């Protein structure tokens, strides 16, 4: 989301996923296998469900859906990671729940910064398209060193998120993560996070390609789509925060 040691910053996507799932399909030669086209189709379906539910909650009266979407999405994500064969059921549910949260969050940002949501969506699509083109043309390759670097950076970022979450219980926060903080350091950190989130897309592409090459079970199309959705949601939210910071300068 050819490689003996696979690393990715996305916890949902790693080589162990394919190793275990390939073992599961041994002796079941008639089982349909994962394809790139199938994964693209599943990703498109997931994005449709996400956008549809986000559109529904893009309203000032729907902010109560944020905790429902965030907590529900987290629970379903954990289930999906440990029960990959359930992906055809859990991933659509995950997309809907995340959409409920994203719609309300997007409305809050757009109410403060008019047009910011359209800009964030446009940038997310542009980054996805350009990186996919660069990956397919061989300009960018997911080498082992690349994966290791992205994995380390992603781990550091999520430790920062975790520290900020824990500090919030004590009335404190990490100011550079605040979207209202328009300092150069805060903007610089946001740019770094957007770059790392974007780099995770390259690893996701590699994961999908590897799964198709190894003949992973058909349900891994949904699981791979799940990993890509996780990265795209993260990237979109970070772009929203970055744009908000630049608007405050």
Regions from the PLM with identified roles:
Residues 1-249:
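A hydrophobic alpha-helical transmembrane-helix feature that marks the membrane cores
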